[in-house]
């Protein structure tokens, strides 16, 4: 049964290695609980996935996209603008308040803090 199914699928996916990748991914989806698009007929998940590809109830392009997405580890996220990013990170809160202390006043305050005068 499976050999006939593979030969039927080669028309839809000419590369046998890619066919194996797509069928195994679909078999994992079925095992995870995705609904079947054809009758099971006492076949196991890999055979069902090959039959789905052969009957074109699962398109190779859609399976390929889902396979690629399942292997992606980094999700692309739109980054906010640089100005908004600084506000979101609280950079404005980290800056000292505006002060009118001169250099001379600062030196005197430091000397007093150290106990010198």
From Swiss-Prot:
A single Gene Ontology biological process assigned to it is: DNA-templated transcription
Could you name the domain of life of the organism this protein comes from?
A: Bacteria
Q: Provide the alphabetized UniProt keywords.
A: DNA-directed RNA polymerase, Nucleotidyltransferase, Transcription, Transferase
Q: Which reaction does it catalyse?
A: RNA(n) + a ribonucleoside 5'-triphosphate = RNA(n+1) + diphosphate
Which Gene3D superfamilies does the annotation name? 3.90.940.10
Q: Does this entry carry the keyword Nucleotidyltransferase? A: yes
Instruction: Provide GO CC annotations from the record.
Output: DNA-directed RNA polymerase complex
A Pfam family cross-referenced in the UniProt record is RNA_pol_Rpb6
UniProt-listed InterPro entries = DNA-dir_RNA_pol_omega, Pol_omega/Rpo6/RPB6, RPB6/omega-like_sf
Q: What is its EC number?
A: 2.7.7.6
HAMAP family noted in UniProt: RNApol_bact_RpoZ
Subunit structure of this chain's protein: The RNAP catalytic core consists of 2 alpha, 1 beta, 1 beta' and 1 omega subunit. When a sigma factor is associated with the core the holoenzyme is formed, which can initiate transcription.
PANTHER family from the entry?
DNA-DIRECTED RNA POLYMERASE SUBUNIT OMEGA
What does the sequence similarity comment in the record state about its family?
Belongs to the RNA polymerase subunit omega family.
- Know the name of this protein? DNA-directed RNA polymerase subunit omega
Q: Supply the source organism for this entry.
A: Jannaschia sp. (strain CCS1)
Gene behind this chain? rpoZ
